[in-house]
């Protein structure tokens, strides 16, 4: 088993993509994680909500805002039995209202990250990491949270070299 886990939340369907709405079959974050999987030996886990947000972008962002304000912890489709075997967790997600989607909080709060290294990666269209790194540190106080990597979602398919540099800097390549 790999000692690195790539845990990610990604959204397909209608997305804000390079200043326009566009339908995508695979979400930007999942695209980036596929590239990472080609670069390193890692297991992957897709964080999926039991009741997913709307496929319509504008409706989705309103649902996500409502969940954020309510500090909701959406139920997930599944969870890994354990993350004990992993030293490093690459946590990848889109920027939802300046932080992670609430489903990512559900995932993080389910496990003990004490002594683990978390590498945040956030896809976005200009809003960067937001306060997600701070939120991860608060949610996982025993973890070593390294500097995150913001990836422009509309450039997800062209992120290989950026990912390579980041993974090398974090000694995963």
Region locations from a protein language model:
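N-terminal beta1-alpha1-beta2 submodule of the flavodoxin-like/Rossmannoid cofactor-binding fold
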Residues: 1-88, 98-99, 105, 161-173
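Short, conserved loop/helix-junction motifs that constitute active-site signature segments
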Residues: 83, 109-115, 139-140
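Glycine-rich, N-terminal phosphate-binding loop of Rossmann-like dinucleotide-binding domains
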Residues: 93-94
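Short, conserved acidic/polar surface loops in the N-terminal third of protein domains
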Residues: 101-102, 131
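Hydrophobic packing residues within well-ordered alpha-helices of enzyme cores
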Residues: 104-107, 136
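Short, glycine-/small-residue-rich phosphate/pyrophosphate-handling segment
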Residues: 119-158
